[in-house]
A protein has these predicted regions:
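Short secondary-structure capping/junction motifs at helix and strand boundaries
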Residues: 2-4, 17, 122-126, 358
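Short glycine-rich, polar/acidic loop-and-turn segments at beta strand-coil junctions
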Residues: 10, 53-55, 66, 103, ...
């Protein structure tokens, strides 16, 4: 009995593990440029949020450059205070705040450290403060408090620096590929991209590209390549898409046998039987997807004569399966929810009855 329970437990654990989804992480690039800085990305589910800061007159302004400073937009107001509010209310989730320094590295970093400590956020386990942009040299990373980590941007010195203060490794995507996020990356560039990711993973550090394509195809490719933080200016959309990526992806593990018609008939003979198959929601996209998943072949694609039919219901532009099938089976349009009847709900002959002389 105990053995049976143990086996059942192991089977359930294995099943649970197999069903676990990969937690793809999205980095909200240039979050300060959004209509609602911080909140839009946070509510949207971003795992990492980027904020550019410039130190001027002892104030940390949220801006890309000094000449774009808006005195109402400070690091404390737009980011640190909301984080403190969430922490006080017990609603704070794990988050990486990547602070991209645009002014002098050392003086700005001192101001950032003091600002975080002022809000008592320096010992909050859920928060990870990561310094990017203008940073001190890697050899000076250890001089800063434990709650300050760094976004290292060099793949060539990972074996020579103290990695304990490195939160992630980020590099410019354009140094490795010119792919625009549509179609496929060319093989030589794909190899460079894979090598870059592998270097960071070899030292057990998360990896991010900046200046990377921001399309659904790109998000999918980067997720499959193992990019740990997927860069996006549309974080909520990217999170929503990636959250269902695995369940919306199908991999056919066993090809279905395809029927090969022999076409042994006399074209002058009268057909004896007519087989009318009406697919529900079966268009070119579905046929193409099935064909790709089945190694390029389907039974339906073996037919010599192949056509497409498009119809719309009499009462709506969007046609349901009942009205669509009736139109194709009888040659007469009808309203949605109608099967085998005309718009006045009168019975119709279908094509097999017409051809059979009934």
């Amino acid at each position: 009995m105990k053995n049976s329970i143990l086996i059942l437990f192991l089977c359930l654990c294995s099943l649970s593990f197999a069903q676990q989804k990969v937690n793809y992480k999205v980095h909200a690039h240039n979050d300060y440029a959004q209509e609602f800085p911080f909140w839009e990305a946070y509510i949207g589910g971003a795992s990492s949020i980027e904020v550019d800061v410039f130190l001027k007159e002892n104030t940390l302004f949220v801006t890309h450059s000094e000449n774009e400073i808006n005195k109402a937009n400070t690091l404390e107001k737009l980011y640190l205070q909301p984080l403190k509010q969430l922490q006080t209310e017990g609603r704070l989730r794990s988050l990486q705040l990547l602070i991209d320094i645009k002014s002098d590295a050392e003086t700005t970093l001192v101001a950032i450290t003091k600002a975080i400590e002022k809000q008592n956020l320096d010992e909050v386990e859920a928060l990870h403060f990561v310094i990017s942009g203008n940073r001190p040299e890697a050899k000076a990373y250890s001089e800063y408090p434990d709650f300050i980590q760094f976004d290292h941007q060099n793949l060539e010195d990972l074996d020579n620096i103290d990695l304990s203060k490195v939160a992630l490794v980020s590099v410019n995507y354009k140094n490795y590929s010119v792919w625009n996020g549509f179609g496929n990356m060319v093989a030589p560039e794909l190899e460079k991209v894979e090598e870059a990711i592998a270097k960071a993973h070899a030292v057990n550090k998360p990896f991010r590209f900046w200046a990377s394509p921001d399309t659904k195809i790109a998000w999918t490719r980067f997720a499959n390549l193992g990019v740990d933080f997927i860069n996006s200016d549309k974080p909520a959309e990217a999170v929503s898409y990636l959250k269902t990526l695995d369940q919306n992806t199908y991999v056919n593990t066993q090809q279905i046998e395809v029927y090969q018609p022999e076409f042994k008939f006399d074209y002058n003979d009268t057909p004896v039987n007519v087989i009318l198959m009406i697919g529900d929601g079966t268009g070119l996209a579905q046929i193409t997807s099935g064909q790709i998943a089945n190694g390029g072949q389907l039974t339906v694609t073996q037919l010599k004569d192949f056509g497409l039919s498009k119809t719309a219901a009499t009462d709506d532009l969007v046609t349901d399966s009942a009205a669509g099938a009736t139109a194709m089976a009888t040659g007469t349009k009808t309203h949605n929810r109608a099967i085998g009847v005309d718009p006045d709900d009168q019975s119709l002959q279908n094509i097999t009855e017409l051809l059979g002389g009934k």
